[in-house]
Amino acid sequence: MKIRVATRGSKLSLLQTQELLDQVKAVEPKVEFELVVVKTTGDVVQDRPLYQIGVKGIFEKEVNLAVLRGEADVAVHSLKDLPSELTPGLVIAGFSRRAPPYDVVASREGYSLYTLPKGAVVGTSSVRRAEFLRAVRPDVEVRPLRGNVDTRVGKILSGQYDAAIMAMAGLVRLYGWEAPVKLSPIRPEEIPPPPGQGIVVAVVKEGEAWLIDILRRASDRRAAVEATAEREFLMHVGAGCHVAVGGLARYEDGGMSFVAGYASGGRRYVIKLWGEDPREVGRRAAEEIRKIREGD
């Protein structure tokens, strides 16, 4: 049995894809894979922040098209890159184990969010990270920083930036625990990560029962439950890439905590909820953030 797998061609994308395929191999040892590498708009356009490009699903659209056209059976993505609603005819069927979902301050010196020097140049092209950072540390300078993980790390090491706000998951997957820069995790109560950060997913056509069955058996249950809550939050919060909103679910002992936040104009608002039903918790968190945004 051979499964054709569409993925982006970056080093990190290929590592993430292999991680998920290893989970599939564990439940279906005889399955074989053929990689279909796709170059996306987000990979090609590197000269401006993502929110200025004006394309929805900038890292996922072309990869999913490979499945819709029959060029691949499965599309693999970082869950955080998927919009709240998938292209009709597609479903998320597989979930990797979750890497650390937090954002980090990456620097040569080992700065934390609160030990960054006044006037430090901090790189990020994420609206969410930039708005929360300005709210927490209005005395640092936020500058756009695009490129793959290696490129961004290189700009820190070369001294072009004093630090950058990055996803811990990508750094750990790429470098293990020996990254060339020092990492200081940021608590979600300070800068809530984007929904889905740290989870890699498999997207397939609806109705592909045999493939959906394999991927569901290979999925990590905790990641799937947390993703359900965070996707529900994303669907109901009503915020696009121009709005600084984050949300993180943590599932333990049959219950779920959810930290969500919104930042704008130098102010930030963070809430924390608990519950048992993932969808209900995600919806409640979205409703609270919507109320805050409407009153801001």
UniProtKB/Swiss-Prot annotation:
Its cofactor is dipyrromethane. One of its GO terms (biological process) is protoporphyrinogen IX biosynthetic process. Its EC number is 2.5.1.61. The keyword Phosphoprotein does not apply. The modification S-(dipyrrolylmethanemethyl)cysteine is found at C241. It catalyses: 4 porphobilinogen + H2O = hydroxymethylbilane + 4 NH4(+). It is an enzyme of class 2 (transferase). Coiled coil: none annotated. GO terms for cellular component: cytoplasm. It holds the Pfam family Porphobil_deam. The keyword S-adenosyl-L-methionine does not apply. The porphobilinogen subunits are added to the dipyrromethane group. Belongs to the HMBS family. HAMAP family: Porphobil_deam. Tetrapolymerization of the monopyrrole PBG into the hydroxymethylbilane pre-uroporphyrinogen in several discrete steps. This is Probable porphobilinogen deaminase. It comes from Pyrobaculum calidifontis (strain DSM 21063 / JCM 11548 / VA1). The gene is hemC.
